[in-house]
Amino acid sequence: MRGNKAKIPRSINTGTYLECADNTGARTLFVVSVKKYRGVKNRQPCAGIGDMVVVSVKKGTPEMRKQIFNAVIIRQKKEFRRPDGLRVKFEDNAAVITDDAGVPKGSEIKGPVAREVAERFGKIASSAAIIV
């Protein structure tokens, strides 16, 4: 897992609802906490593209609902700037359910995936249809 070259604004707080962009059976995810987040006292943990979060499944198949998983954020609405000056933003906030190592649980990913995520998590990049 490599660091990001772009400075990603952390716009996804705990308590945010995300779309699940894979075929695991989950549809809506709820962010419980952020993995490897080191903040200060009384500051809400927040995440951006390429960060791993702990999520709870709110909508989906009965087997998936009310369960806790790790997920990687692959899209966010808040725009971010790449080192070459290009600004990128997506239509929705979306994540992919993974294990602790960052290997996706599903076999396909719906919609585009940010290039920063593809560089950081190779297994997510291999199952993505579009990398932006």
Curated annotation (Swiss-Prot):
Looking up CDD domains in the UniProt record yields: Ribosomal_uL14 (cd00337)
Q: Does the keyword rRNA-binding apply?
A: yes
- Enumerate the Gene3D superfamilies for this protein: Ribosomal protein L14
Cellular component per GO, a single term: cytosolic large ribosomal subunit
The alphabetized UniProt keywords are: Ribonucleoprotein, Ribosomal protein, RNA-binding, rRNA-binding
- Give GO terms for biological process: translation
The protein's name in its UniProt record: Large ribosomal subunit protein uL14
Q: Which gene encodes it?
A: rpl14
